[in-house]
UniProtKB/Swiss-Prot annotation:
Its EC number is 1.1.1.408. It comes from Oceanobacillus iheyensis (strain DSM 14371 / CIP 107618 / JCM 11309 / KCTC 3954 / HTE831). The keyword Hydrolase does not apply. Coiled coil: none annotated. InterPro entries: PdxA_fam. Belongs to the PdxA family. PdxA2 subfamily. This is Putative D-threonate 4-phosphate dehydrogenase. Keywords: Carbohydrate metabolism, Metal-binding, NAD, Oxidoreductase.
Amino acid sequence: MSKKPIIGITMGDAAGVGPEIIIKSLRNRELYEQAHPIVIGDTKMLERAAKILDVDVSFDKKTKDEELMDTEFGKITCIDLDILPEDLAYGEVSPVSGNAAFEYLRMAIELANEGKIQAICTAPLNKEALQKGGHMYPGHTEILAELTNTEEFSMMLSSPKLKVIHVTTHVGLIQAIQMIKPERVHKVIQLAHETLSNSGIKNPKIGVCGINPHAGENGLFGNGEEEEKIIPAIQQAVKEGINVEGPLPADTLFFRAQRGDFDIVVAMYHDQGHGPIKVLGLEAGVNITVGLPIIRTSVDHGTAFDIAGKGIVDERSMLEALHQAIELAPTK
């Protein structure tokens, strides 16, 4: 049996930069020394990207039932779903490519559930195209949760300088505030503790953001949300032996976290967490969905329609996402 994990790489929306960042990342020989990378997508889109990038590589088309551990550097193995037309336009929202991105992910989840791959690494999809293709989800995370019957999950962003986990994600700010409950905050603190502990960090230090400016400043700002929604969750986590502090003003907490005072920050809503991490490390940032029964990592950027097909995309986030998937994946 192989000790190297099989990593399923979904191609994302092929009208974007997904095929290009996959081709560029798989030029790294070390990936093949550490794992068996398998692309799930359309081979013809990868061939087109390789031509744009002037990369000399061959392709090995597979079905889901074929042997997946015979990968080799210089030959990209692809489970070819053959959904897209050869003349798919770059940089345009397309229901066809949106549907294809969903099907790639659905196939990856099926393979993971069957034990044929040990982790999933996703290239970006376009949310508008996804929904125009008939799949009414905000993004990858929610698809993964539904198709794996997972109720409690969270998005974790990881960069070399900072890790952030979110209480709420793809909802409007007013709805996010309504969704923040002590039970949810407590669960996310637990997920942060478990995820970092499992990755080898002993007694990880967790910092929790407030909701209001200055974390409410003892009721001066807001309507007591910190006292009602966050403090009870932190108190419960402390009783469980979790090393957690807060609620703290978000600006102060992120400064202290990037300085090394905390191993991870619990953000209350999407932009509270995404803004700082993208300022500090967009190129090498990674999105990790925690709480799922399968390992999933992703790039921390979108489809970049404005540069798709031009051969200039930076692949560092995809490469780091692959490294994280390999590190987190169980071996066979």
